[in-house]
Amino acid sequence: MVNGEAEAECTRASLLGRYEIGRTLGEGNFGKVKYARHLATGAHFAIKILDRNKILSLRFDDQIRREIGTLKLLKHPNVVRLHEVAASKTKIYMVLEYVNGGELFDKIAVKGKLSEHEGRRLFQQLIDAVSYCHDKGVYHRDLKPENVLVDRRGNIKISDFGLSALPQHLGNDGLLHTTCGSPNYIAPEVLQNRGYDGSLSDIWSCGVILYVMLVGYLPFDDRNLVVLYQKIFKGDTQIPKWLSPSARDLLRRILEPNPMKRINIAGIKEHEWFQKDYTPVVPYDDDDDNYLDSVLPIKEQIDEAKQEKPTHINAFQLIGMASALDLSGFFEEEDASQRKIRFTSTHSPKDLFDKIENVVTEMGFQVQRGNSKLKVMKNGRGSKNLRNPSSFLVCTEVVELGPSLYVVELKKSHGDPILYRQLCERLSDELGVCKTEQIQRTESLEDDLESFDSGSSLPGF
């Protein structure tokens, strides 16, 4: 182990000795991104310097490995390039392509919307890059304008592959089963808590990006997350009539809520709107990056840490990596400070409320039931005042997303968090929602947010 650490320190010294490190480009929960210049060639790079202890403590080692492993596979002009990786005892260094034009999000925010000509050019690059990734067996799963960078020539670069899926993540049915993505860009089938085709869900996200580029605002948006899910699930959006007929047709075919009817990559490339002035991008040659073959000599340390530390997700990770929220297989945490949890279900509202009422009654809670809401209460020490410190109140609501699909929301107004956890565990057992370890995530989020408020800086990447 000592020899490995010494070798890692030499690797780090060798790497940093080849670069002149400059200003900070960004800061986050894992470390910083620094501007760097290669001393021998003068080429510009961005070096992501990550704190290994934080990665281990926040249980993000798998996500960092996934990002590195994915970027090793991808060598395309419209994908951010990973050039070099090194690790010391305390840090991980990722030397990335420097993209100096900012995010596509900023470009749209400044202009309001893009012309069809400019939007088409960028969309062609986006589809070329996504098609290339899919051919490599990589599904991004978090495509959005914030994860699409623009270089000084105005060309795009897809970034942030921390949530990407590789072929080994597919289930026996050939489908993905882990829900990732940002709410406004997530495909409706991903919300259904079933397996989904990663290529078709990426296409949906590309369609939302195209809509934003051409129209200037989101096709699906609402401050209420449940209402937003309803709109996405139903494909409830209006395509402006001032767009060209062919642009409107392509948007309609991409934003088709039924993935079996949605246009695929090949269909997009053959579409008349896409074909105009289209020149396919040629991927880079598969030149060897030999220094990537010895990436991260940290597996032994990570495996040891896994045996010592329980699985959980805390507030620092939540704020810094909000896109990693699981929106279906587990309670989706919108605002931990409000103790709100949600899950999807195919049970009817009546069945859901009947089961919830049976469980909470057995646990000694009182119930008030309405048409689409149910209150779970317990008075403290015989007091009729529900604001008594020892009292407990949880409000439950069921909202229809679509045919035979509902969102159940539980919101703890006040009360003992341990009692709330016990309630969640009982409900999860009865409804078959999630595993105990996932319930623990909710509890740790709640506790960590309270300690987080006392003094940490806001992460940014």
From Swiss-Prot:
Its Gene Ontology biological processes? Answer: signal transduction
CDD domains, A to Z: CIPK_C
Q: Where is the NAF domain?
A: 308-332
Name the cofactor(s): Mn(2+)
* GO MF entries: ATP binding; protein serine kinase activity; protein serine/threonine kinase activity
Out of the domains of life, which is the source?
Eukaryota
Q: Indicate the residues that form the catalytic site.
A: D142 (proton acceptor)
Q: Which residues form the Protein kinase domain?
A: 19-274
- EC class (word): transferase
Q: Which positions bind ATP?
A: L25, G26, E27, G28, N29, F30, G31, K32, V33, K48
Sequence segments annotated as region (PPI): 338-367
Concerning what turns on (or off) its expression, the entry says: By drought and cold stresses and abscisic acid (ABA).
Q: Give the signal sequence positions.
A: none
Catalysis: reaction(s): L-seryl-[protein] + ATP = O-phospho-L-seryl-[protein] + ADP + H(+); L-threonyl-[protein] + ATP = O-phospho-L-threonyl-[protein] + ADP + H(+)
Activation loop: annotated segments: 160-189
Going by the UniProt record, its keywords in alphabetical order are:
ATP-binding, Kinase, Manganese, Nucleotide-binding, Serine/threonine-protein kinase, Transferase
Domain notes per entry: The activation loop within the kinase domain is the target of phosphorylation/activation by upstream protein kinases. The PPI motif mediates the interaction with the ABI (abscisic acid-insensitive) phosphatases.
Role summary:
CIPK serine-threonine protein kinases interact with CBL proteins. Binding of a CBL protein to the regulatory NAF domain of CIPK protein lead to the activation of the kinase in a calcium-dependent manner.
Annotated protein name in UniProt: CBL-interacting protein kinase 1
Source organism per UniProt? Oryza sativa subsp. japonica (Rice)
